[in-house]
Amino acid sequence: MRILLSNDDGYLAPGLAALYEALRPLAEILVMAPEQNCSGASNSLTLSRPLSVSRSAATGFYYVNGTPTDSVHVALTGMLDTKPDLVVSGINNGQNMGDDTLYSGTVAAATEGIMFGVPAIAFSLVHKEWAHLGDAARVAAEIVRHYLDHPLPGQPLLNINIPNLPYEELKGWRVTRLGKRHPSQPVIRQTNPRGEPIYWIGAAGDALDASEGTDFHATASGYVSITPLQLDLTHTQMLAATRDWARAGSGAS
């Protein structure tokens, strides 16, 4: 078994190291991660310049001067002779639930695996600062082991969020849907030394839909949330109405 491991917090992140150590007994692990923290990079690819790959003398981890998606893309198309059995991303320093998944570099690294037909799992720790990281890595390894022993059909993309709790206090796993956030807080305006305005993106909004069945509800209740995602963004319920709208606008009968 071979696992390609990546993240969006960078190759020096504690979450990556903890997950690597937890997965080592399960498979051969190749690590390819971004050189820098790329939180919020989403699925961006670097197309305006060439990419360089380096290897850490301390850990043996490979890293690229690009995005999480670059990392997985380069590994799958330029380094590995055969596909890995699984792409794993994480453990992220903070949750990736609800609308977070659209911006998440952690989820994006996993998504790139799916683009090339490789099953993928993204792991995130719900709160920042790495509290109970070792326990989260233990849970992640259990989930990966279960997947390797009992694979899901097709090429699943699983988004997994782990509460910051001691292992003994976690209540188990729950399969969930994505919740929904309120819009983000407004940007924070400041002034640079030249007197010019600069802007910081505001904090994420609070949970809007945290009802039972959502990832927000599960993790707040002490459960590990497992949300299956898909790449097809088609709004199928809108197809008929959109056809009627387009037909009316084009003058077609």
Swiss-Prot record:
Cofactor annotation comment: Binds 1 divalent metal cation per subunit.
PANTHER family hit by this protein: 5'-NUCLEOTIDASE SURE, 5'_3'-NUCLEOTIDASE SURE
Species this chain originates from: Burkholderia pseudomallei (strain K96243)
The entry's keywords: Cytoplasm, Hydrolase, Metal-binding, Nucleotide-binding
Function comment: Nucleotidase that shows phosphatase activity on nucleoside 5'-monophosphates.
The enzyme's E.C. designation: 3.1.3.5
Cofactor section: a divalent metal cation
The name this protein goes by in its record: 5'-nucleotidase SurE
Residues annotated for a divalent metal cation binding in this entry: 8-9, 39, 92
Gene this protein is translated from: surE
